[in-house]
Amino acid sequence: MSQNRGFYIALTIFLIPILVISLSTAWYYLGFGPKTKVNYGDLIEPSLYLGELDLELDYQYLDIDSMERKWMLITFIKDKCDESCLETIYIARQVNVLLSREQGRFKRYVASTADQLKILEPSLISNYENLNFITINNLDLVESKFKESKVNLFQSTNLFVADPLGNVILYYSGDIDGKKLLADLKKLLKASKIG
């Protein structure tokens, strides 16, 4: 009797992990997995390479290979920078500050046409230190590249995250929640060893 009991206990101990693995595998492949995403921002698929967008930084062609390897927070502006646009730039600055010891891994940018930057730059420089400006040489090209990745660039205010290799990987649009953005950036920095 005790031999049978020991056998059943051993059999149970052996079969439970197999049963759990089998059920979880079936659960996953039948599509019952989680439907929510982990990050707040929207993933850009396929990612965009900044080097293909005909951009200038400091009056020179934007060459990712010669740039400092840092993560980038980029706001694209087409016409004017209204209240929501200014709020997005403000949130980007505050989130960068809240990254504390990791804040040196990020640089903040505003991208717009040369004519628009002439209007925007003086007021933004006086209010937001360490803000960099990217000139968009070909606005139609930039818009079409973003449309290929299913992103309507100027539908609402935006904030994009680009990795240190120049790939635009995440975007946020509309009213951006700074706390959720901060959580996303912390996850990115924790997972990344570059930049």
Can you say where each PLM-predicted feature lies in the sequence?
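Hydrophobic membrane-insertion alpha-helices, especially the h-region
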Residues: 8-28
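N-terminal Lys/Arg-rich, disordered targeting/topogenic segments
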Residues: 1-3
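Short active-site neighborhood of thiol/selenol oxidoreductases, capturing the structured segment around
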Residues: 65-88, 92
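Structural microenvironment flanking redox-active thiols in thiol-disulfide oxidoreductases
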Residues: 83, 87-127, 143
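Short, internal strand/loop/helix patches
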Residues: 109, 121-156
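Structural beta-sheet core signal
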Residues: 75, 108-111, 161
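N-terminal "domain-start" segment that seeds a small globular fold
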Residues: 15, 22, 31-66, 86-87
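Thiol-/selenol-based redox modules, centered on thioredoxin-like
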Residues: 155, 161-195
